From Swiss-Prot:
Catalysed reactions listed for this entry: Cleavage of peptide bonds with very broad specificity
Activity-pH dependence: Optimum pH is 7.0-9.3 for the Suc-LLVY-Amc hydrolyzing activity (with the alpha1-beta proteasome subtype).
Top-level taxon in the UniProt lineage: Archaea
Thermal dependence summary for this entry: Optimum temperature is 75 degrees Celsius for the Suc-LLVY-Amc hydrolyzing activity (with the alpha1-beta proteasome subtype).
Molecular-function annotations in GO: endopeptidase activity; threonine-type endopeptidase activity
Principal localisation: cytoplasm
Basic and acidic residues bias (residue ranges): 1-11, 33-47
Enzyme Commission designation: 3.4.25.1
InterPro entries according to UniProt: Ntn_hydrolases_N (IPR029055), Pept_T1A_Psome_bsu_arc (IPR019983), Pept_T1A_subB (IPR000243), Proteasome_sua/b (IPR001353), Proteasome_suB-type (IPR023333)
Effect of gene knockout: Strains lacking psmB gene are inviable.
Protein name: Proteasome subunit beta
Amino acid sequence: MRTPTHDEFSGRLDSLNGDRSNVFGPELGEFSNADRRADELGDKETKTGTTTVGIKTEEGVVLATDMRASMGYMVSSKDVQKVEEIHPTGALTIAGSVSAAQSLISSLRAEVRLYEARRGEDMSMQALSTLVGNFLRSGGFYVVQPILGGVDETGPHIYSIDPAGSILEEEYTVTGSGSQYALGVLEQEFEDGLSIEEAKGVATKAIRSAVERDLASGNGINIAVVTEDGVDIQRHQNFEGLE
């Protein structure tokens, strides 16, 4: 896979770093000011708090998130879309810094288009997960912990990617501040052979469990279904009729 360091698209970010580091060149080193920026912002930065869930089925994948954003102890938004299409058959959930997540999503969309235009072929989910991991390892997207879900010619895939860039392919996974509550539901409810509709019900139950206990999660649910036909994202202000 092409390493995302090409200057035609990526450009140089000398003015941001004071050196030759580049957000699209994770193999060249990390941002020198990433830790300082995090310390300076602290609770002033808008964060998604969040509970996000990913489940793989034989037909595709289901991604679900809550809809609350927080700033310190304040709810800064009750209507945040925390799952976005980044590939014709791939979507990404976000947990962590809102600004970093928005930048990451925009960068991934652009790199996917560039990759496919240059090569004349679809980017595989393995290649896309590597791209996400490389971006996070660069230190330029502090702190984001996404779940990547998608379908390619080898089938459905769910990847858990931590803020340091490590990548784990899973049958199901969770991220965010409410993850311990959601994980308990998944451990109990997940089984091989779930249909898309059954997986949506399990994901909804997991998110609902988290929002009832986690102060940083709440205000509805986003559900994305990814199949070989594309990405369908639906927003619900409450949980009625979803389980």
